[in-house]
Structure formats: C-alpha cells, structure tokens
C-alpha cells in the first residue's frame, strides 16, 4: 500500500513538472475557422517534402477544420500539390476528377454520394473540397492540386474500374481481365468472407489471377500511356488495390499485425508513386489517423512489430517528413458502438490522469501547437520522454471499456514532430441525407 502511494505521488509530481514545461512551450492557436491566421502558424513546415496531419478520432470537427486550414496554407503559400487521405482510391478518384475539373465532372453532391461513412461524407470535408475546386479552377492543369486515396477497401469498385478502362482502350484484354478476376466475383460484396473461406488454404485460388492481371496491365503500359497517361495511372493503381486487397483479406483472419503492415505498406507505396508521377519537386500532404501518421516505432504498435506510413516516411524522407499529431480531452465525437452500427454522437470521456492528454489538458490552453522539432527543446523532449498512455478513437468508440479499447503506450516526442491540441471538441456534421452504409473503410481495425 505504501509503495503504491509513493509510486502514485512520484507519477503525479512528474506529470505536474511536465505540464509546466509543456505550458511554457505551447503556442496558443486561434480557432481553425480563422483560416489564414490559423494556417500561418504552420508556415514553419512549408519546406517539408511530406506533411502528415493526424487525428485522434475519425469523427471530430476541429481536427477536420484544422487540417483544412493547414492544407489551404501549404497549397497556397508553399507549393504542395498532392493531398492523399485515408480513403479508398476509387472513391477519392471521383473527388479528384471533380476538384481538378476533368471531363464528365459530377456535381459536388454526386461526387460525395458514394463515400461510405461519416468519415468523409461530412460538411467539413465538403467545404474543403469546394474550396479546392475553386482554387484549381484558374490554374494550368499541371499545377492543380490532386485529391487521392491511400486505402485498400474498394475491391469491387477497383475491379470495376480496371474493367471499364480496358473496355475503352483494349476490349480483348478486358475479356482476359474478366476471366482473371472472375474468381473473386462471389466475394466482391463482402470480401471478408473470402478471407474466412481461404484462411486454411496454403495458397489462394484467386491470387494468381489478380497478380497476372496487374502484370498484364503493366506490361502494356507504354502502349496505354501514349493514349491517356492519367487514365492508365488510375487503372494501374486500381489493379494494385485489387492485388493488395486480395492478400489483405486472406491475412486478416491469420494475423492482425501482418494485415496492418500490408495496408500501411500499400499506403506508403501509393504515396511514393504519386510523388514520382508529379516529378522531383512534388510535395504532399496526408490526412490520416494518428495511428497511421505517427512514427509507429515510438508506440506500442511498433514494439509489437507493426509499422505505419509515418514510420515509412520518416525512414524515406528523414527531416523532410513532418509528422503532426492531434489530440483532445473531451467533447463529442461521431462514431458507432459496434461494427456496422449506425453513427452516433457520443460523449468523449475526459482523459485518464496517466495520459499525455491529461498533461495537455492541465496546461489550460484551449487550443495550441507544441513543436519540439526545432530550437532548444531538450527540456520539453525530456519531460515527455517517458512512455505514457495516449488515446485513439476510430470508427468505433466504446467509452465503457475505454482503457482496454482505446489507450496505448507511446513516447509522444518520438512519435510526432509537433502536436495540435484542442481541449474540448465537437462531432463532425454529416452531409444532409448522408448515411453510413457498406463495409466501413477502416475494417477491421476502426483506425
């Protein structure tokens, strides 16, 4: 009993010291709605090759509005021309065609009609997309900012996109592609059933077909690119999504670690292809959950053998990659109670006393940027160098089991380069008429 009281006293004293140091280092921020004024604080990151902007939940308005304000600033003032988000490639491609004023562009409402969840079908994203379309309107096509998806949960849509492309440019190859993809036809509506059905097989009956189709498409790339390079790029990426998704759903029932790593490797590979396609000076912004954009090596994920796109960017780009985490103490969030359940507006529990969030809450700064990347920040880094709990809320939120369901250990100053803090937050606003449907695009992790 005495030992536990001593330990608690020491923890409390350490947290108080860390809070004082964080308070001194934190820069108060205006509201994200003060777009330009808010965005100016992030000019310091404008020289980066890749800026990764996180979120501690998939349903917090302030995170989306802050990322939008930062992104506008980086696009307008610092030459960023790629926005890659934690969404499926085929869904994001529809938005990309809209914002870059491509032929047969849909209306903005049509462009959003197929997003599967509140994660992207919300007013905050809609408003940013309308801004991006207006920004691009008077620019040369080669200078317009693109909107791309990094994720892999579009097996059926990506198959359809490959076939539609080949029907236009190479009908004979389209017939062969239909035969190669035919094995997956029974599973397209619910690919998780495919993973369950093949989990005891040494080799998937569908693997050879999807690999062969990707290879066939790439073998003819010189012919296809001469016709329409952008359309081929989209088709080839959809074929890669099919290949990765087929593998992912097989791994899903065998190893959560391996399936997570496959997914984030695909995200990073997609990013590098986007940068290469834009040329050597291209600069990208990423929107994804903290669990993807922070350096996994500094978290319990990495200690258990998982990696993510943030760690891959750190390894590939060094200091030219900037990893910015986001956090909150309390408020409301859009999430579901169970997998496939309806969206609910839930109350977020105040952060645990032994968490990083509690340290930032006790600074009594409502909204702040804490940047430990530059200058003499050794005292700040030392104060936050001890592993502490950090909260992650995905598509699902279970406040009754929050400690087990949503907290993990991390060293925040190694996980991120900077941290954006909102003491109290509110849920995103779903688009009018929007409804969550279909398999969530974060299955099976909720992040």
What residue spans do the PLM features occupy?
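Structured catalytic-domain cores with a bias toward divalent-metal coordination
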Residues: 1-447
């Amino acid at each position: 009993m005495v030992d536990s009281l001593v330990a608690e006293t020491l923890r409390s004293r350490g947290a108080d010291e860390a809070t004082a140091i964080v308070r001194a280092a934190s820069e108060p921020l205006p509201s994200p709605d003060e777009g330009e004024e808010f965005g100016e604080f992030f000019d310091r990151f404008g020289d980066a090759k890749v800026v990764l902007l996180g979120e501690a939940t998939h349903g917090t308005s302030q995170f989306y509005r802050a990322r939008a304000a930062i992104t506008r600033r980086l696009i307008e003032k610092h030459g960023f021309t790629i926005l890659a988000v934690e969404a499926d490639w085929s869904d994001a491609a529809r938005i990309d065609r809209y914002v870059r004023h491509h032929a047969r562009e849909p209306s903005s409402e049509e462009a959003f009609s197929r997003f599967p969840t509140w994660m992207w079908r919300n007013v905050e994203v809609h408003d940013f997309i309308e801004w991006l379309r207006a920004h691009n309107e008077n620019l040369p096509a080669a200078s317009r900012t693109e909107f791309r998806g990094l994720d892999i949960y579009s097996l059926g849509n990506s198959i359809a996109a490959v076939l539609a492309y080949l029907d236009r440019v190479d009908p004979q190859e389209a017939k062969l592609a239909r035969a190669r993809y035919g094995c997956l036809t029974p599973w397209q509506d619910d690919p998780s059933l495919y993973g369950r059905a093949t989990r005891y097989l040494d080799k998937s009956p569908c693997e050879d077909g999807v690999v062969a189709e990707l290879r066939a498409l790439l073998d003819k790339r010189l012919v296809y690119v001469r016709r329409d390079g952008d359309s081929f790029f989209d088709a080839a990426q959809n074929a890669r999504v099919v290949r990765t998704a087929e593998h992912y759903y097989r791994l899903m029932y065998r190893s959560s670690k391996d399936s997570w790593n496959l997914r984030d490797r695909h995200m990073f590979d997609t990013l590098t292809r986007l940068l290469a396609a834009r040329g050597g000076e291209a600069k990208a912004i990423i929107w994804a959950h903290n669990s993807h954009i922070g350096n996994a090596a500094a978290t319990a994920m990495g200690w258990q053998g998982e990696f993510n796109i943030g760690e891959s960017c750190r390894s590939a780009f060094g200091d030219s990659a900037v990893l910015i985490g986001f956090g909150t103490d309390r408020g409301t969030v859009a999430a579901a109670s169970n997998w496939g359940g309806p969206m609910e507006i839930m109350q977020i529990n105040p952060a645990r006393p032994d968490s990083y969030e509690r340290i930032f809450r006790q600074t009594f700064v409502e909204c702040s940027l804490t940047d430990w990347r530059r200058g003499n920040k050794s005292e700040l880094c030392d104060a936050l160098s001890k592993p502490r709990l950090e909260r992650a809320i995905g598509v699902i939120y279970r406040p009754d089991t929050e400690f087990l369901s949503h907290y993990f250990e991390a060293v925040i100053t190694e996980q991120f380069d900077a941290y954006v803090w909102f003491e109290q937050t509110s849920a995103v606003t779903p688009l009018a008429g929007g409804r969550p449907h279909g398999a969530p695009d974060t299955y099976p992790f909720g992040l």
